[in-house]
Amino acid sequence: MARKPDPGRRIVADNRKARFNYEITDTVEAGIALTGTEVKSLRGGKATIGEAYAGPSGDEFFLFNAYIPEYLEANRFNHETKRPRRLLLHRRQINKFLGATQREGYTVIPLKIYFNERGRAKVELGLGRGKKLHDKRETAKERDWQRDRARLLRDKG
């Protein structure tokens, strides 16, 4: 049975492939610095983070390659669709991500963009390591087995 959505948390974009392609070890909620037209476009439910990643630029973290389309009702002061967007993180979180990406071969992947209870845009970041092909096959096999098992139990009972 599907989970009921959290009443205060409206998900705008979900990176479902990230959990398949990466082994996520830790997740962190981060704020994101947006312009007005980006917020309006997000409120319309339009964003793509399938190819996005987070990385350092100087001593800050940015969200790269996230696509937020232009707001159609805006005038000439619209935003760039794939510009780097600053992530609002605490210093210790930035240092943790920097250490993991530089020393241990991890990647920082955006998992979701959503609006919290107060109406602020947030990004759920995951610290993950890329899966090998045999790990992906194992995940697919496990998922198929769970589906078959549920079907068998449902049909028997």
Curated annotation (Swiss-Prot):
Q: Which domain of life is it from?
A: Bacteria
The UniProt record lists the keyword Disulfide bond: no
Keywords of the record, alphabetical order, are:
Cytoplasm, RNA-binding
Q: Which InterPro entries match?
A: SmpB, SsrA-bd_prot, SsrA-bd_prot_CS
Alphabetically, the GO molecular function entries are:
RNA binding
CDD domains per the UniProt record, alphabetical: SmpB
Tell me which SUPFAM superfamilies the record gives: Small protein B (SmpB)
Q: Which PANTHER family match?
A: SSRA-BINDING PROTEIN, TMRNA-BINDING COMPONENT OF TRANS-TRANSLATION TAGGING COMPLEX
Q: Can you say what this protein is called?
A: SsrA-binding protein
Q: Which organism is it from?
A: Methylobacterium nodulans (strain LMG 21967 / CNCM I-2342 / ORS 2060)
